[in-house]
Amino acid sequence: MGNNLMQTDLSVWGMYQHADIVVKCVMIGLILASVVTWAIFFSKSVEFFNQKRRLKREQQLLAEARSLNQANDIAADFGSKSLSLHLLNEAQNELELSEGSDDNEGIKERTSFRLERRVAAVGRQMGRGNGYLATIGAISPFVGLFGTVWGIMNSFIGIAQTQTTNLAVVAPGIAEALLATAIGLVAAIPAVVIYNVFARQIGGFKAMLGDVAAQVLLLQSRDLDLEASAAAHPVRVTQKLRAG
């Protein structure tokens, strides 16, 4: 019995070669899912790193602006893909659409709404790929378990056909079946961990972008208040002259 076990190839590749076609398909599917997981990890990691570094630099530059026009001048060098520039454009577009309106509070509310929608849209865009990670992390263990159950069923069928409980006959089939579960866990565990890491990073990035949006809204609010004060100042001067 020991010689038969030694002659049986129990390496990972050997178990795969001797596995049933259904178990092979399960293993291949899980390996492809693992490849997708790591591809998403590397691509999104680079994207997060670049976007966060760029947004942090833009936020520092915009902190020096004292008006919306000055912020637009600073953002002119950010490039067309700049998220900060998009937020500034939202505020500027609302000012242009609301030209002639004396309701400054309404302008601020509409601008705030547009900025919130823009931040939410960026968050959804940054979260692309996380759905695949969640799906892989959730179903991979069960897919691997299906392969294990199928492989053990075939092992029992082999025992019935050979009418022997010799370990040399039973062990390879069971080992092949358990390999499917192992591959399922290898695919699922990194997917769940990476999903949670990205979820935290997306939340942090949205918070940083929200700070930029608040900075843009602050500049617009200051401009509107200063314009309103400048328009009201001549009236107060005229009233004083008449009283005198």
Region annotations inferred by a language model:
Residues M1-A19, N166:
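Short, strongly hydrophobic alpha-helical membrane anchors
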